Regions:
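Active-site-adjacent substrate-binding region
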Residues: 301-328
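Active-site-adjacent mobile loop/cap segments within catalytic or ligand-binding domains
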Residues: 322-374
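A short, glycine/acidic-enriched catalytic loop
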Residues: 187-191, 263-298
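N-terminal catalytic or cofactor-binding beta/alpha core of small enzyme domains
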Residues: 20-253, 262-267, 362, 370-373
Length: 374
């Protein structure tokens, strides 16, 4: 029987190598164990926010995996589209000019009172029919003379879609403004004037100019505050403004001085002239046309202005019944000698709220466009 030969290392390998490998492995295990212990200790000893952060991150990872798993389990055709935000409706009409009015909760204890009234066309020898509207004649001209002149065609022709300005809108009393309350009240001491062009006559003129331009009638709008800082001399100021425009743009045929009225009772109650057009309340409007009296009021072209006033009155009342008060034909100057299409128009009064006036300005401009282009 042969004796077993002792086990030998492969040639060239030392007996110390296996022991070194074992030692290295043992050391690595010790280091790993120590690191794990330090991490655990740090977690247990960490401040609460740090621990919460770690837990939160872990929870996020779990939820993320759960969400991915859930998404994978839903067929593609059954996937739910992300929720879409509902876009606010785009306002394209006169509503885009409206402002937020003060609620009744803002009403002071000593607020002033406003009443509403719809004015009719009037009757009697002073009132001359003008289509569905009327002309209140306070001059010495006979009713027959006024009626005959009102029946004449416009003394000028508007060039539709022309780049040359045809109409100028301006404001002698630009700081006149309106009630800003939704209810029928006004703040005591409110003088119904403001230099803020977003709420005074400039706001109404802007609506009118935009409406005419949209109808193809090139219109300029001047927002000079001719009555500020001094009310005195406002007509001289506005006259100079209009003359500058006429010199620069001789194509202008119509000049509109846009104001608001101020109807107030003896007890301080303000009256708002109103009407309802297409289910919405509007301020009533009134055209004022001057007449030459031969002395203090020199208006040699008053007949041409009267024709224009009558055409506009007829158009507005035909299109929007109840919108107008009778045209006031009186011995007033108002710089109406500058063109044969110069008129003053009162859009509501200081008792109306601003939105009623803005709406009325829009309607008046629509009626004007029809009158000028017919």
């Amino acid at each position: 029987m042969r004796s077993r030969e002792p086990w030998r290392l492969p040639a060239g390998q030392s007996r110390a190598v296996p022991f070194l490998q074992a030692a290295v492995l043992f050391a690595a295990l010790c280091i790993f164990a120590r690191s794990a212990a330090l991490v655990l200790a740090a977690f247990l000893a960490a401040p609460v926010p740090a621990a919460q952060t770690l837990l939160h991150l872990g929870q996020q990872a779990v939820e993320s995996r759960a969400a991915e798993s859930s998404a994978e389990s839903v067929p593609e055709a059954a996937s739910v589209p992300p929720e879409q935000e509902t876009a606010a409706p785009v306002q394209t009409g006169v509503e885009r000019y409206f402002v937020a009015l003060q609620p009744d909760e803002a009403r002071p204890a000593d607020a002033g009172t406003v009443t509403e009234q719809q004015f009719g066309q009037g009757s009697g020898e002073k009132y001359i029919p003008c289509g569905a509207g009327s002309i209140k004649n306070t001059t010495r001209q006979t009713a027959a003379d006024v009626a005959a002149e009102a029946a004449q065609p416009l003394p000028f022709a508007i060039e539709k879609d022309s780049a040359a300005p045809q109409v100028l809108i301006m404001h002698t009393h630009a700081t006149e403004d309106y009630r800003l309350s939704a209810g029928l009240w006004f703040t005591p001491g409110d003088g119904a004037r403001s230099t803020d062009r977003s709420i005074n006559m400039c706001a109404v003129g802007r609506v009118m100019a935009d409406t005419l331009n949209a109808a193809g009638i090139c219109t300029l709008h001047d927002e000079t505050l001719n009555d500020y800082p001094s009310y005195t001399g406002s007509y001289a100021n506005s006259r100079a403004v209009v003359q500058q425009y006429l010199a620069q743009y001789p194509s202008i045929k119509v000049v509109l001085d846009v104001h608001r009225d101020a109807i107030e009772r003896e007890n301080g109650t303000r009256c708002a002239p109103v009407c309802s057009i297409d289910g919405r309340q509007a301020a009533q409007v009134m055209i004022i046309c001057g007449c030459d009296n031969g002395t203090s009021v020199q208006l040699p072209a008053w007949r041409q202005n009267l024709r224009f006033a009558a055409a506009w009155e007829r158009s507005m009342e035909a299109k929007y019944p109840g919108l107008t008060r009778p045209v006031l034909f009186s011995y007033r100057f108002y710089n109406q000698d500058l063109t044969t299409g110069s008129l003053l128009i009162e859009i509501g009064g200081h008792g109306n709220n601003l939105n009623e006036a803005l709406y009325a300005g829009y309607l008046a401009a629509q009626g004007l466009a029809d009158a000028l282009l017919s």
